[in-house]
């Protein structure tokens, strides 16, 4: 039975970027019309009770959670990329490339306090249809800590059909860049509020992985994986999403195929467009980025040049593009940068593509930053 939990009780139990581009006046005019929203930045140096306190202040600075979640079902996509056995120098996964359980639990707790009716923790664990809770246990996490953080907390592995009888088809407004629609686990449709709870990292293919790239993982490998079924989705997910990276095959025939089969097969072209499509089709209402401790040089221990970094940051906003723009600036990158410039040396900018789709603005001049100023918290991701 799931019990109610006071703030004090929760704190006690959880404990534990083609060289240079010319931007046309027309492009700038469109960008200036893209939606914008404030972004909160908070300093947090350790994963303790401070996480709840800092996040609570940040959410208040954004206007409070109650107006967003009271009486509603909230879905939270967390970032548990790779396998539980993938570690950087034997460090716990949550100190490098996974969203930290303290940040997950604190967010769940504050959403519950704000009156969320139901909270679902979602992720698509690699190559398995086992319950998400079991995947967490492999990393020595305790799912019951999350269950005690709010009155009703559920878990779902979204890498396959899950508990529903059919997949949900989410359409990209105005037609999409790579696909017109994506077939997803029901949990991404059966919610009133969608939260992307990400990690502050660079990415070998997409330049950075923040609140938008985190949504790449909402796609089920039973349809979009290398070993997905040809006609119908496979029953169990196997392998990764190489289809999105290289385009060597199409999704299961039950889903829609690519818009243009003659488009480039370059992962640096394809992946950013898929991500931009996804955040347009499944809008993010709240973006939270864990940068207290993380890794740079890539998205996981399997990339080269990776290193553990203590950046001491939490970032949150109600628009995923504006939030990622501020996060990029905090990492020492220019959010207006595109292919050929750091961190997008070999890829197109997901931020620019999402901005072009009208999701949000990446122009810092249009974004109000509340809490800690960028200048006071900025670090160099390439030398940290």
Model-derived features with residue positions:
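Extended, low-polarity segments enriched in aliphatic/aromatic residues
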Residues: 30-384
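N-terminal secretory signal peptides and thylakoid transit peptides that target proteins
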Residues: 1-18
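A general, composition-driven signal for non-globular sequence regions
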Residues: 1-2, 21, 71, 207
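C-terminal segment of classical bacterial N-terminal signal peptides
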Residues: 23-27
């Amino acid at each position: 039975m799931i019990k109610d939990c006071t703030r004090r009780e929760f704190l006690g139990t959880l404990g534990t970027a083609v060289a240079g581009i010319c931007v046309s006046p027309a492009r700038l005019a469109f960008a200036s019309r893209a939606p914008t929203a404030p972004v909160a930045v908070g300093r947090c140096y350790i994963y303790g009770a401070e996480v709840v306190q800092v996040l609570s202040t940040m959410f208040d600075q954004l206007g409070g959670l109650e107006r967003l979640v009271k009486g509603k079902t909230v879905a939270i996509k967390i970032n548990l990329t790779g396998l539980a056995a993938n570690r950087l120098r034997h460090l716990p996964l949550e100190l490098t490339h996974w969203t930290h359980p303290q940040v997950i639990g604190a967010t769940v707790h504050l959403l519950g306090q704000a009156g969320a009716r139901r909270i679902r923790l979602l992720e698509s664990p690699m190559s398995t249809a086992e319950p998400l809770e079991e995947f967490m246990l492999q990393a020595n996490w305790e799912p019951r800590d999350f269950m005690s953080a709010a009155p009703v907390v559920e878990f779902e592995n979204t890498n396959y059909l899950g508990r529903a009888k059919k997949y949900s088809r989410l359409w990209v407004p105005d037609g999409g860049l790579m696909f017109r629609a994506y077939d997803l686990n029901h949990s991404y449709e059966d919610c009133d509020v969608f939260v992307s709870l990400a990690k502050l990292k660079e990415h070998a293919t997409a330049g950075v992985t923040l609140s938008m790239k985190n949504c790449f993982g909402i796609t089920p490998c039973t349809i979009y994986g290398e070993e997905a079924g040809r006609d119908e989705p496979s029953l169990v997910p196997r392998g990764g999403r190489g289809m999105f990276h290289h385009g060597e095959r199409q999704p299961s025939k039950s889903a829609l195929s690519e818009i243009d089969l003659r488009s480039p097969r370059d992962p640096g072209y394809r992946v950013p467009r898929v991500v931009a499509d996804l955040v347009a089709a499944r809008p993010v209402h709240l973006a939270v980025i864990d940068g207290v401790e993380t890794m740079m040089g890539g998205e996981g221990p399997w990339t080269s040049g990776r290193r553990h970094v203590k950046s001491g940051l939490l970032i949150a906003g109600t628009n995923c593009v504006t939030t990622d723009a501020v996060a990029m600036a905090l990492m020492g990158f220019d959010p207006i940068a595109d292919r050929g410039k750091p961190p997008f040396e070999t890829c197109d900018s997901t931020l620019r593509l999402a901005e072009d789709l009208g999701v949000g603005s990446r122009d810092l001049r249009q974004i109000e930053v509340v809490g800690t100023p960028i200048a006071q918290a900025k670090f160099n991701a390439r030398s940290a």
